[in-house]
Design a protein with these regions (language model features):
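Gly/Pro/Ser/Thr-rich low-complexity, intrinsically disordered segments predominantly at protein N-termini
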Residues: 1-132
Length: 132
């Protein structure tokens, strides 16, 4: 997927992100204030996500950890800060600490994230997310 900036070139915050009027199925990630459009996943990608979600769900049943497939916002900072500049949506997110789970997604580092890679992923895109 080519990187696409949303709206005009500027730095965005979580507050901005929450106020965007997005069309159905439109998704973005904020990484250090830069907004990147996310393309719709293909059928193979979705099949892998579904299979892994089912396996993790079964494994985690009865444990404090919960599995969340995308779209599920992950903010790496725990504090309630509307000025956060990074919000990502990993393909799968596991969160064990109940205090990190909220109606708006995960606040703080999750216990596990899974990204399904595809041939369309660029090296720059993968490095950008890995460095988080």
């Amino acid at each position: 997927m080519p990187d696409v900036l949303v709206k005009e070139e500027r730095l965005w915050t979580y507050r901005d992100y929450r106020e965007w009027d997005l069309k159905e199925g439109e998704r973005y990630e904020l990484i250090y204030g830069v907004a990147y459009a996310m393309s719709a996943p293909n059928a193979v990608h979705q099949s892998i996500v579904a299979a892994l979600t089912a396996k993790f769900y079964t494994f985690l049943e009865g444990k404090p950890c919960k599995i969340y497939p995308a779209p599920y916002d992950v903010r790496l900072f725990y504090e309630e800060d509307e000025n956060d500049d990074t919000v990502v949506q990993p393909d799968l997110t596991v969160v064990c600490d109940e205090k990190k789970r909220g109606p708006e997604g995960c606040r703080g580092a999750p216990d596990l994230v899974v990204e399904i890679l595809s041939p369309s992923n660029t090296v720059i895109e993968m490095e950008r997310k890995f460095d988080l």
